[in-house]
Amino acid sequence: TRGIVSGNRYRWGRYWVQTDAAINSGNSGGPLINLDTGKVIGINSATYSKRMSEGLGFAVHMIRACRVLELLKNGIDPSPPYIPVSFTQADNKLDQLKVAAVYEKQPHLWPLEPNDTVLALVGFENNPFVHQSDLIHALRGQDGLVELLVERLGIRQTFTITARPRPNLLDKIGVHVSGIIFG
């Protein structure tokens, strides 16, 4: 393979640089390099099943990777935040995040309701959320109160949410999966 970039894709909940580079468990995490400039444009991360396609690989875009590196450099945990909300695509608008359900009924943490449309972080309105991965990326490194720009019943409003790290599964005594508790 030559590592030819064939496009940017949204797949599995995040943006990827699509390439024909052969990616496997031995080289995942390696750089995807622009041969014209010598710059790293992505971090090779995943491959599509060889049965489905031949040589279809995906790399994390450097914009996302650089943000994680910057957070690490500053001693900030870059882990994805805990988001107690599920999303769906807004009606006939593939470029908006519409709230489908709120898992924790704690309005002081996430005062969102089903059918709210989450637009952007306050102060970053020029970077609107298109997919859930945009929200996750924007909230990386945040710990505490954050303001979201939300549209509810046609009215744009600001809501303060509590951003917190995702709970570590290893800290749990038991895990509930499909009606069974493993402890």
Residue locations for each model-derived region?
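Active-site loop architecture of trypsin-fold serine endopeptidases
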Residues: 1-2, 12-29, 35, 39-66, ...
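Short beta-strand-centered aromatic/proline hotspots
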Residues: 3-7
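Short, conserved beta-turn/loop elements at beta-strand boundaries and strand-helix junctions
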Residues: 9-13, 91-92
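Extracellular/periplasmic catalytic domains that process cell-envelope and extracellular macromolecules
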Residues: 10-11, 25, 33-35, 112, ...
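Conserved beta-propeller blade repeats
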Residues: 30-31, 108
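Hydrophobic beta-strand positions
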Residues: 32-33, 150
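C-terminal recognition in membrane/secretory proteostasis and scaffolding
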Residues: 40, 67-183
